């Protein structure tokens, strides 16, 4: 226990300092002065504000020893005398602080004595004699214990440091004055080390407020309202960190009202009533009261109702701030008395401006100069996600982390320095590390963010946007949403928005729910995403949901007629006697369901419609195919439109050739018609077998008529080469999708074995298109060739020149009186190919093949017992 004396406090303090300096106490390893009664850190004296006051008071009283002539002042004991042990003051033992390495005990004594000199010099400015005595005593003690005289060195170092510190103070003071003039929240700045940086950065003027341009700039009425001295009751609603509390404090400070602030987290009905009572008393003196309630949504219904009478009577002006939707969390009666202003989260540009301002004022607020590059600033603004408090707290943590890296000695020097030491801290994106990681997404179960996210997911699925669907699902899962809730909502989507358009959607959603239930997070994420994307890509139909709502509305407006008798169940004999189930037609007993004539609705509403299936949106796959097809057709149309109207010279030549071929076709048709008419006249009196041949000739005539009609259509559109080619192919019964060789039936006109008598009459051919030399007594015909030579009755050679046009050969679809076994050979190697003509009982053929075009005509007649017709097959 320490000993107590009756001397006054000033004497105790001064004697304490004298005792510590004269007894040559030793500084231990932890940096403390030790004696028998106490352990005390000499650097902690300045932390005690009461000790400061006592020290200064004692310094003023010490002037008695300097020949003070004031007789009314009581005599004080001489503080320079060596105190007795009874004058020692004992202090409670202080907790040990982190240690730092001491050079040696002798130097420690010197440093401690020098520190005592500095303390006495700073605190006893009015008593120079006492300071000199103390310095002498300290120096004597140092010499006696260590034999070292550091007085000269200490004085020199102190002088140099004071000069440097004075220059630093001048520069810092000038910078501080500029900052205080620039920002209103620094005007009455008082450094509070315990306040977080975000609180110290809170603006006090609307000119310094960042963000909410739509509210403060876009709406001038609201801005004037906030700046006016007369305020209504209003609620500020917005996400965290957007400036609700700051704006409310700025607006309240501009009015002439008393301001009372409460937080709904730690207050209740009692606190509200106390504020209302005080406001009622001040109102009697003509001054109103503003009650600001932060997080007002935390109040329950009863607590909110307490505010209603005071607001309605004008006793208080309520300003509330909330992060939850007021329409859900606040009473309707309270909302009717307060205007709600919705605030948006800060933009990335707003946060970058705020971060740069924070970097500018931190030298004044925290004795640190933060230096950040643009990349780090943009990354921090991105991670903050509209929350100003998050951005400033990251900077605050970076500064505090830098302080932890300092040694104990550096912290003590900085703490007790009056020079305003400012240290530079360079912060890069890499150095901040995990501080730039997003800790959480905006998500509050049961709040606005929760319902907004699930609404966005549902509408993305309905709109068949798989990309957006995946984003919202993953964001909800990463925000901490219950996965079972998400799949329950997807079950609803499968029946509401997809329905009958894809009957596998609902079973898949139920399977996803079971998978989540069995597996759990995080393994179930793939199952949830798979189901969500499938629902987004599926076809859509809301027929079930639409007609359910329609029928429900109908039932609310109309009475319900009874169930028809034939549809009622009759499990008992009595009910059967009543006629229940009579005349019911069991559908499975009818093979033809059209025989079922019963109706299934009551008679009054049998014509009402209560369901009709409608496909509102096809699947993504079907739409993609349709879009591709539409795109291809549009490209073809564009190509046709972009083609020049004037054709090139090769195209014009091709068109002229086609027109010539059409003219040749007309001439060939005339020849065929004449030959057919002659054959009909000759065969009119022949046998029944020949009559069948006559019928076939009539069919040929019909085909020729069709060819003539087609040619007439071609003549009307002879300017379009593509259409002409198409009609020519159609007239020759050609299909480009089929193989090249097509068959056209043309029976032989004459039978060489049985009808030799008629050869001389029929072998007359019409006027040839081009002259050809043909030498044979049974064949006198001309086709579009330059030279045809028939050697004998068994074989003939047909030679074509190089300028032979194979398109014209298609017109010679009928060659009469070809001898049996005759061969037709083409001499041109590049264009033709030789084939033998074989004669059988039912078929004769002539084949002429070209590398560019293959035109084939053939015919097979039914066998006739007496005189079967001999078909001729022309293969081109």
UniProtKB/Swiss-Prot annotation:
InterPro entries: AAA+_ATPase, AAA_assoc_2, AAA_ATPase_RarA/MGS1/WRNIP1, ATPase_AAA_core, DNA_pol3_clamp-load_cplx_C, MgsA_C, P-loop_NTPase. Residues 56-85, 104-175, 626-647, 714-731 have a biased composition (Low complexity). GO terms for cellular component: nucleus. One of its GO terms (molecular function) is single-stranded DNA helicase activity. ATP binds at residues 240-246. GO terms for biological process: DNA synthesis involved in DNA repair; DNA-templated DNA replication. This is ATPase WRNIP1. It comes from the Eukaryota. It is found in: Nucleus. Belongs to the AAA ATPase family. RarA/MGS1/WRNIP1 subfamily. Residues 835-849 have a biased composition (Polar residues). Its EC number is 3.6.1.-. Functions as a modulator for initiation or reinitiation events during DNA polymerase delta-mediated DNA synthesis. Has an intrinsic ATPase activity that functions as a sensor of DNA damage or of arrested replication forks and regulates the extent of DNA synthesis. Residues 56-175, 621-647, 714-737, 833-876 are annotated as: Disordered. It catalyses: ATP + H2O = ADP + phosphate + H(+). Residues 850-863 have a biased composition (Basic and acidic residues). Pfam families: AAA (PF00004), AAA_assoc_2 (PF16193), MgsA_C (PF12002).
